[in-house]
Swiss-Prot record:
Belongs to the V-ATPase 116 kDa subunit family. Subunit of the V0 complex of vacuolar(H+)-ATPase (V-ATPase), a multisubunit enzyme composed of a peripheral complex (V1) that hydrolyzes ATP and a membrane integral complex (V0) that translocates protons. V-ATPase is responsible for acidifying and maintaining the pH of intracellular compartments and in some cell types, is targeted to the plasma membrane, where it is responsible for acidifying the extracellular environment. Required for assembly and activity of the vacuolar ATPase. It is a multi-pass membrane protein. This is V-type proton ATPase 116 kDa subunit a 1. Its main location: membrane. It comes from Xenopus tropicalis.
Length: 837
């Protein structure tokens, strides 16, 4: 349970794998997913490593599978996913897989080539069929006298004078419909109006044999005179990618050709159907095994990639690897190595040897489906340093609670909870569907965050007594107006006063606090906002200071664990004193005033703001301002002096002690060896004992002795000054930052009230017969706006503000976030279908 609050303890281990067993051992480690391999060949080009040929073969198989997958998806065939996790094939099985994939690829390419040729032939015959059909109509129109008059410009004047018969040449073809207007203008300009074009649309779209898209085309016939115009027309048709077809001149020949074309189309359609059936059978057979093939190939590829990270022994019989792994999983890792050795048939066992290192290990926080989302929220700010306190367990409660303080509405909380419950209940089915929608996937990953946000919103909504901007009268109001009529309000007062105030000092008016939350009578009061603003503002300050103080307290656990006594005495203690003497005292004042003053003494209750300002100014001369309690002046002066003392305590003392320790080590001749200091001085982070940790995160090179420790007093003073100023000013600014809890809560309540008043109230106010029908549309609009504005937009706003309060105001008190994530070699992503590497 303790590891939940810190990252797992990691160790660097060395693996000695026999060459014949290395493949199977790495395979078992990939199934386990608990080791992160280090690259022991950083200076070797990826194309010069030992297993580069095997990687290329896997990539070639992967390419063939992607081709098959593309063809399967193009045919709208679903890929079978049984959730099976196939075992990694042995290296000797790669030849069979390659042959199988090669056979499928060649067969599919042959089918596609033949099918494309058949479809192209089918398209040509179909176009010819429409040409023969349409041209007959064109030739029938040639007998029309109007056509002769329209085409008279095609004849030479001498021929017209001699009354020679009209002898015109023609070409017929098919062109894309959208090119017709440009095509017609080009013919007219190039041929100077000496051609006659007739065109008709083909009603049914034709299929492009290459892309498979539907294309709309038109049939055209061009009449001209002379070979020169004929050549021009053909060149223009070629430029516009029009398909020209031979068309007989006599009706009888056209009829005979049409009959032959129809017969060939029928035969070709039969062949096309048979080809498509065969293609479907091949693709359906491939679709059944495609996912398994993908997993096998990509597991093999991942294994060979990992083997390329290892060193080869000089005898070529052993591979040496270095891995980061959790100490708690060493037994399971050794068991996986034994299992891999047995599968390979090797008689020499693999060896796991723990290594001593001064390099910073990666950070590994174990998660489950519930804590996964909260850990991601923390990691988005920065990966925690190795073994420091993990904020995620505390964030599980504080994050949804602070969100709910801003979002608090009973009705909206129920809607959010129902949505989260739906995702949680159906999570298995949703996971199996592998939805690609990025927005939904993101929300589904945070389903438990949304669930807790909804539950806490219900809780805070009950405290605020706010449900869709309306109060719930669950227990009956504790206020009564009847005593005011009998004892205080006269008839004359009632006639001339529009706003009346209930006096809690009158017996019977106020009967004690409401059992839970805000009394519903406040929803009717004109000073509702005044009361709620005061309550929420003070509550925000109290919650914020408690949250920050808890963050400072967590820093103590880090200092104790890392054995840094200087940070405790010169960091944690003055920080905690500074926080509690000023802002902790403010919380006590707020609670004290709530308890010390009731309705009868509220008129003389002093202002906390004035008292708090006077506390810093040491201003107590104003006798008209009553004290909150006896001895207040002396206590407040003492608290301010303590807070002031904490500033030089944090600023000056630590650099001086570090300098004194450095001079003492230098005098005694103490040196650093391999990053580990040998001497009498206490361990301290600012002395930079392990100097090359940051470099090791990037270089991952072999361990080298660290250089002799260098201490710069000026840098240390500047660093400490920045930290002190940041903390002292941060306490003030961060406390003010928590007022966003009040501001967003107010905004959400006001938006909810506006939406009810402007939409739902209007629908409920209609008294006519059509009011019921109108209410249906009004409620639809109300529900849509509620979800879009109040749940999604306002919810996202509250989410981001709660995130900021955790990242900045809370985590900066104890969380370094300068580590790097543990990225184990694992087949999990491959099993889940996330094939992209």
């Amino acid at each position: 349970m303790g590891e939940l609050f810190r990252s797992e303890e990691m160790t660097l281990a060395q693996l000695f794998l026999q060459s014949e067993a290395a493949y199977c051992c790495v395979s078992e480690l990939g199934e386990l997913g608990k080791v992160q391999f280090r690259d022991l060949n950083p200076d070797v080009n990826v194309f010069q490593r030992k297993f580069v040929n095997e990687v290329r073969r896997c990539e070639e198989m992967d390419r063939k599978l992607r081709f098959v997958e593309k063809e399967v998806k193009k045919a709208n065939i679903s890929i079978l996913d049984t959730g099976e996790n196939p075992e990694v094939p042995f290296p000797r099985d790669m030849i069979d897989l390659e042959a199988n994939f090669e056979k499928i690829e060649i067969e599919l390419k042959e089918i596609n080539t033949n099918q494309e040729a058949l479809k192209r032939n089918f398209l040509e015959l179909t176009e010819l069929k429409f040409i023969l059909r349409k041209t007959q109509q064109f030739f029938d129109e040639m007998a029309d006298p109007d056509l002769l008059e329209e085409s008279s410009s095609l004849l030479e004047p001498s021929e017209m004078g001699r009354g020679a018969p009209l002898r015109l040449g023609f070409v017929a073809g098919v062109i894309n419909r959208e090119r017709i207007p440009t095509f017609e203008r080009m013919l007219w300009r190039v041929c100077r109006g000496n051609v006659f074009l007739r065109q008709a649309e083909i009603e049914n779209p034709l299929e492009d044999p290459v892309t498979g898209d539907s294309v709309h085309k038109s049939v055209f016939i061009i009449f001209f005179q002379g070979d020169q115009l004929k050549n021009r027309v053909k060149k223009i048709c070629e430029g516009f990618r029009a398909s020209l077809y031979p068309c007989p001149e006599t009706p009888q020949e056209r009829k005979e050709m049409a009959t032959g074309v129809n017969t060939r189309i029928e035969d070709l359609q039969m062949v096309l159907n048979q080809t498509e059936d065969h293609r479907q059978r091949v693709l359906q057979a491939a679709a059944k095994s495609l996912r398994v093939w993908f997993i096998k190939v990509r597991k093999m590829k991942a294994i060979y990639h990992t083997l390329n990270l290892c060193n080869i022994d000089v005898t070529q019989k052993c591979l040496i690897a270095e891995v980061w792994c959790p100490v708690a999983d060493l037994d399971s890792i050794q068991f996986a190595l034994r299992r891999g050795t047995e599968h390979s048939g090797s008689t020499v066992p693999s060896i796991l040897n723990r290594m001593q290192t001064n390099q910073t290990p990666p950070t590994y926080n174990k998660t489950n489906k519930f804590t996964y989302g909260f850990q991601n929220l923390v990691d988005a700010y920065g990966i925690g340093s190795y073994r420091e306190i993990n904020p995620a367990p505390y964030t599980i409660i504080t994050f949804p609670f602070l969100f709910a303080v801003m979002f608090g509405d009973f009705g909206h909380g129920i809607l959010m909870t129902l949505f989260a419950v739906w995702m949680v209940v159906r999570e298995s089915r949703i996971l199996s569907q592998k939805i690609d929608n990025e927005l939904f996937t993101m929300m589904f990953s945070g389903r438990y965050i949304i669930l807790l946000m909804g539950l806490f919103s219900i809780y805070t909504g009950l405290i605020y007594n706010d449900c869709f901007s309306k109060a719930l009268n669950l227990f009956g109001s504790s206020w009564s107006v009847r005593p005011m009529f009998t004892d205080t309000w006269s008839e004359d007062l009632l006639k001339h006063t529009s706003v009346l105030q209930l006096n809690p000092n009158v017996t019977g008016v106020f009967n004690g606090p409401y059992p839970f939350g805000i009394d519903p009578i406040w929803s009717l009061a004109t000073n509702k906002l005044t009361f709620l603003n005061s309550f929420k503002m003070k509550m925000s300050v109290v919650l914020g200071i408690i949250h920050m103080t808890f963050g400072v307290a967590l820093s103590l656990l880090n200092h104790i664990y890392f054995k840094k006594p200087l940070n405790i005495y010169l960091g944690f203690i003055p920080e905690m004193i500074f926080m509690t003497t000023l802002f902790g005292y403010l919380v006590i004042l707020i609670i004290y005033k709530w308890c010390a003053y009731d309705a009868s003494t509220s008129m003389v209750a002093p202002s906390l703001l004035i008292h708090f300002i006077n506390m810093f100014l040491f201003s107590y001369q104003d006798t008209s301002l009553p004290m909150l309690y006896k001895g207040q002046m002396g206590l407040q002066c003492f608290l301010v002096v303590c807070a002031i003392i904490c500033v030089p305590w944090m600023l000056v003392v630590k650099p001086l002690i570090l300098r004194r320790q450095y001079l003492r080590r230098k005098h005694l001749g103490t040196h650093n060896f391999g990053g580990i200091r040998v001497g009498n001085g206490p361990t301290e982070e600012d002395a930079e004992i392990i100097q090359h940790d940051q470099l090791s995160m990037h270089s991952e090179e072999g361990e080298e002795p660290a250089m002799e420790e260098v201490f710069d007093f000026g840098d240390t003073v500047v660093h400490q000054a920045i930290h002190t100023i940041e903390y002292c000013l941060g306490c003030i600014s961060n406390t003010a930052s928590y007022l966003r809890l009040w501001a967003l809560s107010l905004a959400h309540a006001q938006l909810s009230e506006v939406l009810w008043t402007m939409v739902m109230h209007v629908g409920l106010s209609i008294r006519s017969l059509g009011g019921g029908i109108a209410l249906v549309f009004v409620f639809s609009a109300f529900a849509t706006l509620t979800i879009a504005i109040l749940l999604i937009m306002e919810g996202l706003s509250a989410f981001l503000h709660a995130l900021r309060l955790h990242w900045v105001e809370f985590q900066n008190k104890f969380y370094m976030g300068t580590g790097f994530k543990f990225l184990p070699f694992s087949f999990e992503n491959i099993r889940e279908g996330k094939f992209d590497e």
